[in-house]
Curated annotation (Swiss-Prot):
One of its GO terms (cellular component) is host cell cytoplasm. Belongs to the RxLR effector family. A motif (RxLR-dEER) lies at residues 35-53. It is found in: Secreted; Host nucleus; Host cytoplasm. The RxLR-dEER motif acts to carry the protein into the host cell cytoplasm through binding to cell surface phosphatidylinositol-3-phosphate. Glycans are attached at N41, N74, N258. Secreted effector that completely suppresses the host cell death induced by cell death-inducing proteins. This is Secreted RxLR effector protein 40. It comes from the Eukaryota.
Length: 274
């Protein structure tokens, strides 16, 4: 019996480690690098055109594994609906996602003497990405490695550790999307790196435009409007939108220019020793 349990457990671990290309292809173009899971080729399959239901069919267990993955990576409810909606039998998973998201709407991060909700924290994630914040900077700013002296301090530290991990997930997601778009430029130049003014533009064209805008000192807020972020959006929806990689790219280019124009810090100038 024990051996049987070990075999089943090992099988489950192997199952959850498999990337299902069929499901990934079903959500291609959504602008993310999620890994989607399956049990076997027969479990996840597209319903035939003659079938009564559209989308993909999968076991409830597999769909819930995907839902849990979306929750772990801090995707918004609207984005979870978009992804899970690719399945014909997704309603139960959506209900579970809604339930779990409601439970984590408080104590997501502690900043400026108050606990933030998930949406407020993710708004900070957007700011950090545009500022180029690194893991080391955040760990230093949040004083992650100081031993907490009270239960409240310990809770604050644990909450902020989780927030930093969530932010790093966003950075990994952004790097993967940026890399994929870079590869698209060489494999299929018709794929757009960004879309605005009713047209899709290639990566080379966008970077050329960005170079000109940086030289003129075009503000980030102006580029934000050009890329279609002028309407109120939830931070997670903004992050997962198709133009966000371009937006973050311009922010980085602008930072690099501004940093190059700053005079050197006095404490960083080496002095000859006597």
């Amino acid at each position: 019996m024990r051996l049987y349990t070990q075999v089943v457990a090992a099988s489950l671990v192997a199952t959850l480690a498999i990337v299902d290309s069929k499901v990934s292809n079903a959500i291609a173009g959504q602008g993310n690098n999620l890994r989607f899971l399956r049990q076997d080729n027969a479990t996840v399959a597209r319903v035939s055109e003659d079938g009564e239901r559209g989308g993909l069919l999968a076991d409830e267990k597999d769909i819930m594994a995907i839902a849990d993955h979306l929750i772990r990576l801090n995707y918004s409810l609207s984005y979870a609906r978009k992804v899970l909606g690719k399945f014909a039998n997704y309603e139960y998973a959506i209900a579970k996602v809604e339930e779990k998201i409601k439970k984590r709407t408080v104590s997501y991060m502690f900043l400026d003497e108050k606990f933030l909700t998930q949406e407020e924290a993710e708004g900070k994630f957007i700011e950090w990405i545009l500022e180029g914040k690194t893991q080391e900077q955040l760990e230093r700013e949040f004083d992650i490695f100081t031993r907490p002296e009270s239960k409240r301090a310990k809770k604050i530290q644990e909450v902020n550790k989780f927030a930093i991990r969530a932010y790093l997930d966003w950075l990994r997601n952004l790097r993967a999307r940026s890399f994929r778009m870079t590869m698209m430029e060489y494999t299929n130049p018709s794929n757009a790196f960004a879309t605005f003014d009713r047209h899709g533009h290639s990566r080379n064209k966008i970077l050329s435009m960005f170079d000109a805008w940086v030289a003129k000192g075009t503000l980030l807020d102006v580029v934000k409007d050009r890329l279609g972020f002028n309407k109120p959006m939830k931070p997670a929806d903004m992050f997962h939108s198709d133009n966000f990689v371009a937006y973050a790219t311009y922010a980085q280019m602008l930072r690099e220019k501004n940093n190059s124009l700053r005079p050197p810090r006095l404490d960083s100038v080496s002095t000859p020793s006597n």
